[in-house]
């Protein structure tokens, strides 16, 4: 049993849990202005069960291509034996359904709408016949929805409406999400082509994809600077993503695997930028 739990948690990418739990918690706190049981329920859901489902479904239906991908098998993606696939799918359902029921019951019609979109995006990204991850450009939009939707749910679940400033921040976050998905796809161009998989990066090439990623990161930084002072500090923090991706501005399809270096930096940049945002918000609150 402990081995099964270990494999399930490995598949859920613990290093990336913060990317979904933090947006929910931050949006909830900014809009509701308080921490209650619903806040903690959402945090727990988007921290672990949500990621078990999102990455678990992906690992099951991407098994054949992941076997050919040298970067899979660690923090960047588990390659679980086929004997574990049914367990992983059951875990995805069992761990999420109770949380979903409560979030639907105690949420608002608007948060329920975003929650429905979030669940559909998680399933559609990897599930057979839908496979949004193999539909160029839709793949980036869907992946970004995975990370933006928790924030939208957090911002609307208590009955308050997001302010204009929050919508701008969410727009910046959505651009960040698209840029990040494209950055991740660059390193897999050759592996995906060998497995006959399509992605935005296989269609426009590694160089085109990395440059699009840089542009989207830059737009995200510019958009957030339109918010009231001192949002420009967050804009500067986002520029670290721009510089990280821009290092590979002239990458080619033949050398696409080199982009893995930027992806490894990206995983840790999330913690740095998250810390900057947190410290900034604490400082503003104290002022």
Curated annotation (Swiss-Prot):
UniProt-listed Enzyme Commission number(s): 2.5.1.149
UniProt keywords, alphabetically: Cell membrane, Membrane, Transferase, Transmembrane, Transmembrane helix
Topological type in the membrane: Multi-pass membrane protein
Gene inactivation effect: Mutant accumulates lycopene and cannot produce neither flavuxanthin nor decaprenoxanthin.
Catalytic activity: all-trans-lycopene + dimethylallyl diphosphate + A + H2O = nonaflavuxanthin + AH2 + diphosphate; nonaflavuxanthin + dimethylallyl diphosphate + A + H2O = flavuxanthin + AH2 + diphosphate
Pfam families (alphabetical): UbiA
Main location: membrane
Compartments, as annotated in UniProt: Cell membrane
Pathway info: Carotenoid biosynthesis
TM segment ranges: 15-35, 37-57, 87-107, 137-157, 166-186, 218-238, 265-285
Alphabetized InterPro entries for the sequence: Prenyltransferase_related, UbiA_prenyltransferase, UbiA_sf
GO-annotated cellular components: plasma membrane
GO molecular function, one term: transferase activity, transferring alkyl or aryl (other than methyl) groups
UniProt-listed CDD domains: PT_UbiA_4
Free-text function comment from the UniProt entry: Catalyzes the elongation of the C(40) carotenoid all-trans-lycopene to the acyclic C(50) carotenoid flavuxanthin during decaprenoxanthin biosynthesis. The enzyme acts at both ends of the substrate, forming the C(50) carotenoid flavuxanthin via the C(45) intermediate nonaflavuxanthin.
Family statement: Belongs to the UbiA prenyltransferase family.
Protein name as it appears in the record: Lycopene elongase/hydratase
Native source species: Corynebacterium glutamicum (strain ATCC 13032 / DSM 20300 / JCM 1318 / BCRC 11384 / CCUG 27702 / LMG 3730 / NBRC 12168 / NCIMB 10025 / NRRL B-2784 / 534)
